[in-house]
């Protein structure tokens, strides 16, 4: 393919996306302080579409730790973990994460996407089968596809459908993979039933608790803490540090044997530069705050109840979510975009989520709540939604 043909193909694809209302572009916010952001044209908006569930992303304490360590050590690690990039800060964070989640050990990855690709590829391959919920995050589906294992998807949250698929399958090794909290719907996976199925069928269970860690459980240990499941019930736990923890990166936690295996086999960990020591040190502090400042979870839960009650009073439909993810399905992509723009005109930033992220005809306003929000800000959003979507 020559350069001209490539340009034509790209132009046609982009034009089709624009025509369907599916063209994407990053939105620039000059700054975000707590729940408020400053747009490129200088307007202040209340942000209701971030994943900063505990309001830690703008807390000054992790920032001060980062500044101190950056002053001492510079901005980067300089190498991969297995070369010369592994520092005491990485060790400290891995110990803190293992302790928080009740696992023997943890391994730090640069992103959640890399963690999911790396761990699935390290555990299964040709001759094996991966079973995934149809609404799993793209990184989980991509991990299964890239591993070479057979991918079999089951209906969302349907353990009976999964049981039938397990009974029909003759794979050498079988891995059940699920989100803990589903990122676009906000509902929780039936992890206790999945753990039982895994035991009954000799399969392994992997849970990506990106949106549950820090939010669910008495100590913020996530959906597995809330459900009382240990590392034998769920051998592979993935968590992210860029959502409730308010920092950056991800991790895999489980028995020491699992972590030792990943150090040998997880290509997305082996062949990449280790995270910045300064960022990592800041994350250690953020994890401490997420664990011990329980008022953040209590305030967040109160805001979720307040928002749902307000939306119910308006007669609008919400999905059955008790987490900070509160989606309002609008329908077509252009309708969701129009609603998002109308909310921004009223001072509220809520991103429209469109296909292919969600199925066609289910474009939505994905409202996310944070401990940084005030009750008054939540009430203001509810009133604005009533004006924009009022029936």
Swiss-Prot record:
EC number annotated for this UniProt entry: 2.3.1.47
Amino acids binding pyridoxal 5'-phosphate: 112-113, 183, 211, 240
Cofactor: pyridoxal 5'-phosphate
Record-listed substrate binding positions: 24, 137, 357
Keywords annotated in UniProt: Biotin biosynthesis, Pyridoxal phosphate, Transferase
GO molecular-function term, one example from the UniProt record: 8-amino-7-oxononanoate synthase activity
Top EC category: transferase
SUPFAM superfamilies per record: PLP-dependent transferases
Residues found modified as N6-(pyridoxal phosphate)lysine: 243
Protein's GO biological process: biotin biosynthetic process
Pfam families assigned: Aminotran_1_2
Catalyzed chemical reaction(s): 6-carboxyhexanoyl-[ACP] + L-alanine + H(+) = (8S)-8-amino-7-oxononanoate + holo-[ACP] + CO2
PROSITE patterns attached to this UniProt entry: AA_TRANSFER_CLASS_2
Record's subunit section: Homodimer.
PANTHER family: 8-AMINO-7-OXONONANOATE SYNTHASE, CLASS II AMINOTRANSFERASE/8-AMINO-7-OXONONANOATE SYNTHASE
Stated name of the protein: 8-amino-7-oxononanoate synthase
Gene source species: Alkalilimnicola ehrlichii (strain ATCC BAA-1101 / DSM 17681 / MLHE-1)
Gene name in the database record: bioF
């Amino acid at each position: 393919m020559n350069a001209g043909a490539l340009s034509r193909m790209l132009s046609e694809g982009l034009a089709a996306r624009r025509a369907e209302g599916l063209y994407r572009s990053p939105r620039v916010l000059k700054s975000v302080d707590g729940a408020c952001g400053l747009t490129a044209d200088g307007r202040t908006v209340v942000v209701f579409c971030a994943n900063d569930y505990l309001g830690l992303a703008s807390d000054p304490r992790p920032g001060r730790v980062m500044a101190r360590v950056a002053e001492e050590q510079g901005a980067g690690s300089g190498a991969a973990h297995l070369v010369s990039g592994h520092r005491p800060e990485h060790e400290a964070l891995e110990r803190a994460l293992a302790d928080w989640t009740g696992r023997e050990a943890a391994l730090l990855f640069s992103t959640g996407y890399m963690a999911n690709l790396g761990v699935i590829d390290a555990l299964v391959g040709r001759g094996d089968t991966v079973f995934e919920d149809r609404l799993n995050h793209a990184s989980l589906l991509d991990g299964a596809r890239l591993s070479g294992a057979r991918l079999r998807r089951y209906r969302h949250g349907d353990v009976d459908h999964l049981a039938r698929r397990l009974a029909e399958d003759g794979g050498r090794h079988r891995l059940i993979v699920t989100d803990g909290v589903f990122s676009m719907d906000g509902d929780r996976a039936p992890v206790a039933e999945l753990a039982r199925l895994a035991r009954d069928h000799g399969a392994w269970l992997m849970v990506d608790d990106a949106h549950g860690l820090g939010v669910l459980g008495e100590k913020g240990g996530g959906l597995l803490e809330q459900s009382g499941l240990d590392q034998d019930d769920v051998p592979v736990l993935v968590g992210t540090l860029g959502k409730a923890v308010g920092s950056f990166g991800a991790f895999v936690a489980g028995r020491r044997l699992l972590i030792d295996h990943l150090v040998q086999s997880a290509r997305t960990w082996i062949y990449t530069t280790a995270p910045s020591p300064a960022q990592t040190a800041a994350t250690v502090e953020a994890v401490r705050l997420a664990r011990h400042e329980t008022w953040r979870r209590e305030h967040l839960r109160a805001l979720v109840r307040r928002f749902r009650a307000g939306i119910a009073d308006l007669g609008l439909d919400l999905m059955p979510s008790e987490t900070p993810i509160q989606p309002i399905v609008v329908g077509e992509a252009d309708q969701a975009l129009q609603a998002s723009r109308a909310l921004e005109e009223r001072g509220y930033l809520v991103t429209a989520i469109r296909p292919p992220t969600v199925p066609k005809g289910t474009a939505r306003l994905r409202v996310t709540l944070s401990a940084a929000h005030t009750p008054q800000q939540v009430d203001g959003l509810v009133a604005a939604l009533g004006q924009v979507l009022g029936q």
